[in-house]
Structure formats: C-alpha cells, structure tokens
A protein has these predicted regions:
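C-terminal cap of thioredoxin/glutaredoxin-like
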Residues: 1-18, 24, 108-218
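Structural alpha/beta surface segment adjacent to cysteine/selenocysteine redox centers
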Residues: 3-129
Length: 218
C-alpha cells in the first residue's frame, strides 16, 4: 500500500513545473520484522516446524497467534480496504509466511543491477505474498520474481546458492538505515540536503507535502 501511494504521488508530482528537472529515484533498504535468529530459535525450541526456513508456516494461523482471533479480522478488513483503495486487487491471507533473508539478499543484489529492477523485484515479491498466497522463503518464488523483474536468473540462483552472498552489504545497510525503525513501511525522502521521515502506509498527499517542503511544488 505504501509503495502504491508513493508511486501515485510521484505520478502527480513529476509533471509539475517545479519538478521538471528533478530526478526521482527509489531505493529499498532492509528491515526484518522477524530477524533470521527468531526463526532459528523458533525451530530449535519446537515453536516452528523443522522445515520452517524453507517451507514457512501457515500465515493466517501465525497472525491469529500474534494478534488474537478477535483482533485480527478488523485489522485484515482495514488492510484489505486500504489495498483496494490503492488499486490492489486479490488480497489474501492464505498460504504461508516465512523467513525473508534470501529475499533481502536478492533485493541487495538487485540494487546493483539497477534501481528499476530492484523496485520491480519488490513489486513481484509483494504480489506473490499478499495476492498469490506464495511464501517469501520459497526458492522458486524468489527466482521467478527475479526473472520477472528483469534480473539474470542464473546470477540470482548463484546468490541463493551462496548462503553468505550479500550478507556484508545487507548488514552494513541495516546498521545505516534500520536503527530507530520499529516497523514498515518506513520512508526517508531526501534531496541530499534535507531529509524527511514518514512511518506507515502514508497517503499520496503526505508525500506531496514532503515534496513541497523540498521545493518540488507547482
């Protein structure tokens, strides 16, 4: 939802007189809602099945255990409504959730291949998870997302085959960008001099206000 609202704001802002010479770029930075060690400990303690790292766990059951059977339905109703308002169809809580380390590693690799490809990769991952009931830890899902985003499938496979690939860059970015962040989506909008931070799935109007504060106005 946050991604779609940002894109809507960019579509509105780019034709403006004050934005004609402005180059907008979007870069995705890492953040773990459930860090890899949480999955490792959960498997070791028996909280999660032994194959959770590769197969995931049932998404709906997990969120019920986290938020409660009474609290979850209205939360999902609000999320589904926000998705529809943003033009996203097919929202579903079916399928599995799971570790996202491999997806983060591929997103880090994708950044070097071009920000457009990284953004396309994230779009594929979000669609697979929220609309197609596919697990974020499924190797086939990740490779398909990479291919559909225009990334070299063989190179993406090499990243997945090497457990430590991209971990150094990933850790460095976590240290630089994730400190002080408690949830996602979280946006940093900057012109290189001034920075504005927005937390949550902000409406397009919120981004437009920031653009105006940066001098990108009508």
């Amino acid at each position: 939802v946050g991604k779609k609202n940002l894109e809507k704001a960019l579509e509105i802002a780019k034709p403006r007189e004050g934005a004609k010479d402005v180059v907008f770029t979007t870069t995705w930075r890492p953040f773990f809602l459930m860090p890899p060690q949480v999955w490792t400990r959960g498997i070791a303690s028996g909280q999660f099945p032994e194959d959770a790292e590769t197969e995931g766990i049932e998404k709906l059951a997990y969120y019920i255990s986290k938020f409660g059977a009474n609290s979850l339905p209205p939360m999902l109703e609000r999320l589904g409504g926000a998705m529809r308002d943003s033009g996203i169809e097919g929202f579903s809580m079916g399928g599995n959730t799971g570790p996202t380390l491999d997806g983060h590693r591929l997103a880090t690799y994708a950044e070097r291949e071009g920000l457009d490809k990284q953004n396309a990769f994230m779009e594929e991952i979000f669609r697979a998870y929220f609309c197609e009931e596919k697990a974020p830890c499924d190797r086939g899902v990740l490779l398909a997302a990479a291919k559909n985003a225009g990334l070299d499938e063989a190179k993406a496979r090499e990243v997945l085959d090497a457990p430590t690939a991209e971990l150094g860059e990933l850790d460095e970015q976590m240290q630089r960008f994730a400190r002080g962040v408690s949830g996602v989506p979280f946006f940093i909008v900057s012109d290189g001099k001034k920075r504005f931070k927005l937390s949550g799935a902000q409406p397009a109007e919120a981004f437009l206000e920031v653009f105006e504060d940066l001098g990108i106005d009508e």
